[in-house]
């Protein structure tokens, strides 16, 4: 897989020669320095950025062979994504934010959204706006939103990066527990090498390539 960006007349290669297979239910952590290509790789795997060369196959479907509408529907059904900065809509309540993937799919998912909030321990905060929630609570809402459609694959980009150590530990415990409980494949970008030891496999990304990949002992 290859991915580059243009800055003026210059082309900057961000990913090159990436070959990666992730087993169903595996928990993989992507580590490496800032600018190494971790987030770009995650975006590409999740169908958010098309590679110039290569393909991404999830559940036997070539993600980038699909047209825009089919690709959006596939991502909605098969992929959950958690952002570092939560990406909650400020004018929507917690439950309404969790409903967003269901709304895109044209379904009434209120009951499922409430169930997702209950799984992350926030059923009693369903009608609160993001500004009324702590950082840890906002990230829990983001996790509930990512899991509401029960996707087989979940991507998380520095999910604890904006949290203090206590909230970071609680959020990661929750995320790992929910993934294990549901058999969800989990791919996490993190700078925290200690955190990465909790996965099944740790991959080191350096200068756009996977320079090391090993099972966590």
What is each stretch, according to the model?
Residues 202-215:
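H-loop (His-switch) and adjacent beta-strand-loop-beta switch element
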């Amino acid at each position: 897989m290859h991915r580059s960006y243009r800055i003026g007349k210059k082309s900057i290669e961000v990913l090159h020669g990436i070959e990666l297979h992730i087993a169903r239910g595996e928990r993989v952590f992507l580590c490496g320095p800032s600018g190494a290509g971790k987030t770009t790789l995650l975006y590409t795997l999740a169908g958010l950025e098309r590679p110039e060369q290569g393909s991404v196959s999830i559940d036997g479907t070539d993600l980038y062979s699909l047209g825009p509408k089919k690709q959006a529907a596939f991502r909605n059904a098969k992929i959950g994504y958690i952002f570092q900065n939560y990406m909650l809509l400020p004018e929507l309540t917690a439950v309404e934010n969790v409903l967003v993937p269901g709304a895109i799919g044209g379904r009434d998912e209120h009951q499922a959204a409430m169930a997702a909030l209950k799984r992350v321990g926030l059923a009693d905060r369903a009608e609160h706006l993001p500004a009324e929630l702590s950082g840890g609570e906002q990230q829990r809402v983001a996790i509930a939103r990512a899991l509401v459609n029960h996707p087989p694959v979940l991507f998380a980009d520095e999910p604890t990066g904006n949290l203090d150590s206590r909230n970071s530990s609680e959020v990661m415990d929750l995320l790992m527990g929910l993934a294990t409980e549901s058999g969800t494949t989990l791919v996490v970008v993190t700078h925290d090498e200690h955190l990465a030891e909790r996965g099944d496999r740790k991959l080191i990304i350096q200068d756009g390539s996977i320079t090391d990949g090993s099972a966590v002992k």
